């Protein structure tokens, strides 16, 4: 069985005629991110992330685009979930590595955010990702867990893991550095 077939793809569908004949579309919508961010400035980072998780505030556009959700948030920790889908595939028939990188950037950044006071923000300064195994539709639901490693006044670091919910197998892991600004 090919890697493509193991991940849920069809090795025979990769022909030019098959690819051209099966065009698909996908649409999504989102809320004004500036309005959501303005509301978030009134809340602690943990309150803000939990409000998004509870549906009290809309998720950011990137979450709507990729279809991931915050499923847990505690002080210094954030967990996201996503269902791998065909539209996320790269040219060789598996989920594009940018999906795992985005999940890691999001869960680690939100882990940092949960430690911040109202009105304090952050931005990613660096992101390192290590890929362990490929994702496909057959992988099933995937979780991304970020944990705060260091939370200072000016900088913070976090680590994260992306893994299959059903089997716990590690897909990717990473670290991030963030600049804190008030």
Model-flagged regions — what are they?
Residues 1-182:
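Terminal targeting signals and extreme-terminal segments of soluble enzymes
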């Amino acid at each position: 069985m090919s890697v493509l077939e193991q991940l849920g793809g069809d090795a025979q569908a990769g022909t030019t005629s098959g690819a051209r004949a099966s065009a698909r579309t996908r649409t999504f919508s989102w809320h004004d991110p500036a309005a959501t961010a303005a509301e978030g400035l009134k809340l602690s980072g943990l309150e803000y992330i939990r409000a998004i998780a509870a549906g009290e505030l809309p998720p950011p556009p990137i979450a709507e685009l990729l279809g991931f959700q915050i499923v847990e948030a505690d002080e210094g920790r954030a967990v996201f979930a996503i269902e791998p889908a065909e539209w996320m595939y790269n040219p060789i028939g598996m989920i594009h590595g940018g999906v795992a990188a985005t999940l890691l950037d999001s869960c680690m950044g939100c882990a940092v955010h949960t430690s911040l006071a109202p009105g304090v923000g952050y931005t990613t300064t660096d992101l390192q990702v290590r890929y362990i195994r490929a994702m496909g539709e057959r992988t099933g639901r995937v979780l991304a867990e970020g944990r705060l490693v260091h939370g200072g006044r000016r900088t913070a670091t976090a680590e994260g893991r992306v893994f299959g919910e059903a089997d716990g197998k590690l897909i990717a892991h990473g670290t991030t550095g963030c600049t804190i600004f008030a």
